[in-house]
C-alpha cells in the first residue's frame, strides 16, 4: 500500500508540473532598493523646526534617516568638531519611507510572492498598497510576508513608518516600577538619568553612546528589500553540517529546509569542488510533503583538505552546490562555501584551575588578536572593501582571532567570508553589550527568532569558533557598583525574576539555538564567564576582562605582569589617533588636549555633558608617568601611541610566555567607530597606530619575551610552531652609544606550541655596575644567523633615562614593488616613527627601535609617487619628541 501511495504522489506531482508549466520555475528575486523617498512623519513635533525634512525627499536604501539627511546637507557631519548634538533630533523623530514599484504578470502568476526585509531599524509598520502587513520590532531579524493577494499588476506602493526607538520605549518605561540597569546615560537629556531605553530594544546598543563613540540612534531601512516569487518549491536554507572531521575522514550532512506545495519524490543533486580543484557529484532522492520539509543527507569525504587558522596550515575551503529537481525540472538551487574543521573549547582541570583553550583539528591554538567594534556609527557606510582591509590588517599583524563584541550588530556575510579565506578565527557574540535584559518571555521569544536566523545565516563559516551569549552582563550584575545598588533597591522577588530571566536567556534559549543549529561550534554564555561554575571574571577559570590598568585603579602597565588568567578577552590602553586623522575633524584652534572638540571626541569617563569627559586627563596621567610632560600637542599624539603600544606589548608577551596556563590574548580594541580618542590600534581612517605595528612583532610566531618586573627580567621563548626548532638566544647589555658591556649566548630547543622560561636576571646581574640611566639590554632569538625576534629592556621609565637625541638618517628609494626606506642611527633611536601625512602609504614595519649603527630597511606600499613621499616624509623618535627638539 505504501509503495502504491508513493507512486500516486509522484504522478500527481509530475501531473502538476505538466499542467502548470510555471511550477517548473525556480525562485526569482526583484530588488526593491531603488526609488525610495522619506520624510518626517507629519505629526512629529520636529516637523515644525525642520520643515524641509517634513517634505518627501530622496533616500538611499539600505540606509538611515541620518545618512539621507547628511547627503542632503540637512544635518551636519556629526564627526566634525562638536556637531554630535545637532543630529540628536533625528533619532528622536518618527519617519516615513515610501517607494513605488511595478509588478509584471509573470510575477503575479507565480504561486507565491513574498515581501522580504533583510533589516528594519527598528520599530516599523509596513503598508503595501494601503494595507498594513507587518509590525517589526527587532533590528537583527529578517522579515518575510506573503503579499501576492495585495499586489497589483503594474504600479504598487510600499510604505514604511518608522518610530523613534527612544520615544517608543521611554513613555512606557517611565511608568514601570523600576528601570533595568543599562550602560551609558544620554548626555543630551533625551532620557532621564538611570532611565535607559536601550535594554528593552533589539537594536545595536553602541548607537546609544559608548565610552569610545558618540550617541547617534539611527532609524531607517538598513538592509535590502526585495520581492521573492516561486511556485512549487522554495529552498529556505542549505548548509553543510560537520559531525565528524578528522585527518582521515569528514562525515558530513547536507542539510536542506524546503517549503513545498507538492507531495512526492524530489531529487537532490549535491556536488562539491575541493580546494585542490577535484570535484564530485552525488544524487539523493527525498520524499516531500506539502509544507515545511527538513532534509539531512549524509555523505563522506576521505582525507579532507581541512581548514586551518592562519599560521597552522592553509584555510582550505570547499565549494558546495545543491540542485533540487522534480521530474527533471530544476526548482531550487544554492551554493555554499565552507571549510572542514573540528572545533573544541577545551576546559580541563589542571594545576592552575581549569583550562580555556581552543583546539582546532586537534591542535591547541593560542588565540592572538583583538576585539572588533562596529566600524561606523552608520552600518551601511561600511563597505566590503573596508571590512576586508580591517581583516587583512589583523592578519598582517599576526593575529589569528577576532572577538566580535556584543554591543554592535551581526556583521555582513562579506566579513565572515573574508575571515574564512584569511584563516582568522572569530569569537562571535550575540548582541548583548552589558545592559540587563528584560525577563519576560516575549522578549526571549523575539531574541530566539533573531538567534535562529543569525546562526543559520552564519553557520557555514569555518572562521566562527565560538558563539558567546553576551558581553559583561553576568560580571556586571555580579560586581558593578550601579548593579549592586539596583539590587538593593528592588524586592527579593523582583531580583529573582530578573536573575531567572537572564539564566533562561543565556543558559537555555541561546545555548539551545546553537546546539540545534550549529552543534559543531561551542557555546559560552557570557564574557567574562565560567559557564555558571561560580564567580565570573576570575583568573583560574573561564575568560577574563582586566581593567585595573587604565580604568579602575589606573595601575601602571607593569601590573599586567602580575595577572595570568586562563584567557584574556579584554584589556587595553588609550591613545590619540594620527595627526592626519585629528586634522580631519578639527580646526587648528581645536588641537589641544583640553579643547572642547578634543573632549567631545573622548568618551571615556564622560560627565553630564557630551564634551565634559575626564578621559583625556587619564590619558595624560599615563603618558606623563612614562615620558614626562609632553612638549606640545603633536608630541602628545606620538607619546600616547608609544605608551599604548609598549603597555599592551607587556601584557600580550606575558600572556604568550605563560602558555599553557594562559591560552588567549585579545586586547581592546582593533578598530574605531569614529575619529576619536580610544583604545584602538587602527583609527577610523584605517591608519595604523604604533600598537598595530608592535602587535605584528609581539604576535609573531616565534618570540623572545623579556619581561622586567620589580627589578627582575624573566626571559621566555615562545613558539606557535608545531615542530621543535633548535635556536640560540642572546642577551647583550649596551650603552646608548652602542658599546657592548656584556654578552651571553645560549643554545635552546624551542618546543612546539609552547612558552618556556629560559632565564631570570636581576638588574644587578645584567648591569654588573653599569649606569642604569645610560644602559639597556638587548634580547635576541636567533635561528642560525637570522634574528627572528628582539626585545629591549630598560631599567627605568624613559623620562628618567639619559636618552641621547639621535640623528636618524632616512633614505627613500624606488624599487620594483614599491619604495624602500632605509633608516639608521649612530646612537640608540627608540620608537622610530615614519609618517607621510595624509598620503596613502603603509609601511612593512614602523615604531622601530634602531640599535647604534644598525640599518633597518622597510617597504612603503601605496599609490603616492616617490617625489610625493619624499616631500611628505617625517621621521620621529622618542628622545627627540620628549626633548621637544625640532626635526
Listing of model-derived features with the role each one plays in the protein:
Residues 149-157, 255-349:
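Extended acidic/polar, glycine-enriched regions
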Residues 164-170, 326-331, 782-789, 882:
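Short acidic/polar inter-strand loop motif in beta-rich domains
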Residues 26-116, 196-224, 228-233, 348-352, ...:
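Extended carbohydrate-recognition surfaces in non-catalytic/accessory domains of CAZymes
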Residues 401-421, 425-602, 643, 647, ...:
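Substrate-binding/catalytic cleft of secreted carbohydrate-active enzymes
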Residues 256, 596-845, 850-861, 866:
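Carbohydrate-binding surfaces of carbohydrate-active enzymes
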Residues 108-111, 151-155, 302-319, 765-775, ...:
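Short glycine/proline/serine/threonine-rich loop/turn segments at secondary-structure transition edges
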Residues 70-103, 108-117, 121-128, 134-137, ...:
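Active-site-adjacent substrate/metal-binding segments within catalytic domains
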Residues 32, 39-43, 87, 92-234, ...:
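Accessory beta-strand-rich segments of carbohydrate-active enzymes
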Amino acid at each position: 500500500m505504501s509503495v502504491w501511495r508513493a507512486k500516486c504522489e509522484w504522478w500527481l506531482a509530475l501531473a502538476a508540473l505538466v499542467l502548470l508549466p510555471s511550477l517548473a520555475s525556480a525562485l526569482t528575486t526583484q530588488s526593491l532598493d531603488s526609488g525610495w523617498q522619506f520624510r518626517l512623519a507629519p505629526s512629529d513635533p520636529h516637523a515644525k523646526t525642520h520643515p524641509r525634512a517634513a517634505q518627501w525627499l530622496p533616500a538611499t536604501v539600505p540606509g538611515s534617516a541620518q545618512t539621507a539627511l547628511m547627503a542632503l546637507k540637512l544635518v551636519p557631519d556629526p564627526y566634525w568638531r562638536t556637531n554630535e548634538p545637532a543630529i540628536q533630533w533625528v533619532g528622536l523623530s518618527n519617519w516615513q519611507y515610501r517607494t513605488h514599484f511595478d509588478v509584471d504578470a509573470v510575477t503575479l502568476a507565480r504561486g507565491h510572492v513574498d515581501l522580504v526585509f533583510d533589516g528594519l531599524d527598528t520599530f516599523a509598520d509596513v503598508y503595501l498598497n494601503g494595507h498594513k502587513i507587518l509590525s517589526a520590532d527587532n533590528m537583527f531579524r529578517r522579515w518575510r510576508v506573503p503579499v501576492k493577494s495585495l499586489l497589483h499588476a503594474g504600479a504598487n506602493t510600499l510604505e514604511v513608518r518608522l518610530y523613534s526607538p527612544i520615544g517608543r520605549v521611554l513613555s512606557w518605561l517611565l511608568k514601570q516600577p523600576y528601570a533595568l540597569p543599562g550602560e551609558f546615560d544620554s548626555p543630551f537629556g533625551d532620557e532621564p538619568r538611570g532611565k535607559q531605553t536601550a535594554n528593552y530594544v533589539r537594536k545595536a546598543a553602541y548607537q546609544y553612546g559608548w565610552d569610545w563613540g558618540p550617541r547617534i540612534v539611527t532609524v531607517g531601512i538598513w538592509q535590502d528589500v526585495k520581492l521573492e516569487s516561486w511556485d512549487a518549491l522554495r529552498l529556505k536554507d542549505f548548509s553543510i553540517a560537520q559531525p565528524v572531521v578528522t585527518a582521515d575522514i569528514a562525515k558530513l550532512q547536507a542539510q536542506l529546509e524546503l517549503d513545498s506545495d507538492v507531495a512526492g519524490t524530489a531529487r537532490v543533486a549535491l556536488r562539491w569542488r575541493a580546494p585542490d580543484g577535484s570535484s564530485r557529484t552525488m544524487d539523493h532522492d527525498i520524499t516531500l510533503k506539502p509544507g515545511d520539509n527538513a532534509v539531512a543527507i549524509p555523505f563522506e569525504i576521505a582525507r579532507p583538505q581541512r581548514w586551518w587558522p592562519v599560521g597552522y596550515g592553509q584555510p582550505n575551503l570547499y565549494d558546495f552546490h545543491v540542485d533540487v529537481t522534480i521530474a527533471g525540472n530544476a526548482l531550487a538551487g544554492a551554493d555554499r562555501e565552507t571549510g572542514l574543521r573540528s572545533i573544541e573549547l577545551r576546559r580541563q582541570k589542571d594545576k592552575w584551575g581549569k583550562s580555556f583553550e581552543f583546539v582546532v583539528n586537534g591542535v591547541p591554538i593560542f588565540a592572538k588578536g583583538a576585539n572588533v567594534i562596529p566600524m561606523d556609527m552608520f552600518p551601511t557606510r561600511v563597505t566590503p572593501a573596508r571590512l576586508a582591509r580591517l581583516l587583512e590588517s589583523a592578519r598582517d599583524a599576526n593575529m589569528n582571532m577576532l572577538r566580535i563584541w556584543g554591543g554592535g550588530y551581526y556583521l555582513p556575510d562579506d566579513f565572515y567570508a573574508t575571515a574564512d579565506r584569511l584563516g582568522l578565527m572569530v569569537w562571535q557574540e550575540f548582541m548583548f553589550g552589558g545592559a540587563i535584559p528584560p525577563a519576560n518571555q516575549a522578549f526571549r521569544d523575539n531574541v530566539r527568532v533573531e538567534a535562529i536566523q543569525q546562526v543559520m545565516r552564519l553557520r557555514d563559516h569555518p572562521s566562527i569558533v565560538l558563539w558567546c551569549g553576551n558581553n559583561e552582563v553576568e560580571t556586571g550584575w555580579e560586581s558593578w557598583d550601579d548593579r549592586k545598588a539596583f539590587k538593593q533597591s528592588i524586592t527579593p522577588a523582583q531580583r529573582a525574576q530578573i536573575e531567572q530571566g537572564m539564566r533562561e536567556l543565556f543558559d537555555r534559549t541561546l545555548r539551545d539555538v546553537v546546539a540545534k543549529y550549529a552543534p559543531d561550534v561551542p557555546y559560552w554564555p557570557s564574557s567574562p564567564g565560567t559557564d555558571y561554575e561560580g564567580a565570573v571574571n576570575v583568573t583560574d577559570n573561564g575568560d577574563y576582562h582586566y581593567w585595573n590598568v587604565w580604568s579602575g585603579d589606573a595601575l601602571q602597565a607593569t601590573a599586567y605582569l602580575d595577572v595570568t588568567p586562563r584567557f584574556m578577552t579584554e584589556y587595553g590602553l588609550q591613545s590619540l589617533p594620527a595627526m592626519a586623522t585629528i586634522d580631519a575633524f578639527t580646526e587648528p584652534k581645536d588641537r589641544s588636549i583640553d579643547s572642547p572638540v578634543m573632549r567631545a571626541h573622548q568618551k571615556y569617563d564622560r560627565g553630564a555633558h557630551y564634551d565634559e569627559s575626564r578621559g583625556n586627563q587619564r590619558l595624560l596621567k599615563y603618558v606623563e608617568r612614562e615620558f614626562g610632560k609632553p612638549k606640545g600637542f603633536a608630541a602628545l599624539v606620538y607619546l600616547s601611541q608609544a605608551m599604548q603600544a609598549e603597555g599592551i606589548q607587556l601584557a600580550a608577551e606575558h600572556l604568550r610566555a605563560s602558555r599553557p596556563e594562559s591560552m588567549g590574548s585579545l586586547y581592546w580594541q582593533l578598530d574605531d567607530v569614529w575619529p576619536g580618542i580610544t583604545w584602538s590600534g587602527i583609527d577610523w581612517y584605517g591608519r595604523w597606530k604604533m600598537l598595530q605595528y608592535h602587535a605584528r612583532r609581539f604576535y609573531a610566531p616565534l618570540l623572545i619575551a623579556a619581561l622586567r618586573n620589580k627589578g627582575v627580567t624573566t626571559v621566555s621563548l615562545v613558539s606557535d610552531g608545531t615542530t621543535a626548532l633548535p635556536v640560540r638566544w642572546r642577551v647583550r647589555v649596551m650603552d646608548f652609544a652602542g658599546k657592548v658591556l656584556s654578552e651571553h649566548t645560549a643554545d635552546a630547543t624551542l618546543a612546539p606550541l609552547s612558552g618556556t622560561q629560559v632565564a631570570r636576571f636581576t638588574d644587578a646581574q645584567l648591569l654588573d655596575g653599569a649606569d642604569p640611566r645610560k644602559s639597556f639590554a638587548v634580547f635576541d632569538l636567533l635561528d642560525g644567523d637570522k634574528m627572528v625576534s628582539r626585545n629591549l629592556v630598560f631599567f627605568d621609565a624613559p623620562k628618567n633615562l639619559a636618552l641621547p637625541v639621535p640623528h636618524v638618517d632616512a633614505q627613500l628609494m624606488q624599487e620594483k614593488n614599491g619604495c624602500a626606506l632605509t633608516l639608521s642611527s649612530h646612537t640608540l633611536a627608540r620608537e622610530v616613527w615614519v609618517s607621510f601625512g595624509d598620503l596613502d602609504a603603509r609601511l612593512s614595519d614602523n615604531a622601530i627601535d634602531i640599535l647604534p649603527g644598525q640599518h633597518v630597511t622597510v617597504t612603503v606600499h601605496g599609490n603616492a609617487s616617490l617625489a610625493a613621499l619624499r616631500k611628505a616624509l617625517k621621521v620621529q623618535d622618542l628622545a627627540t619628541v620628549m626633548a621637544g627638539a625640532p626635526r
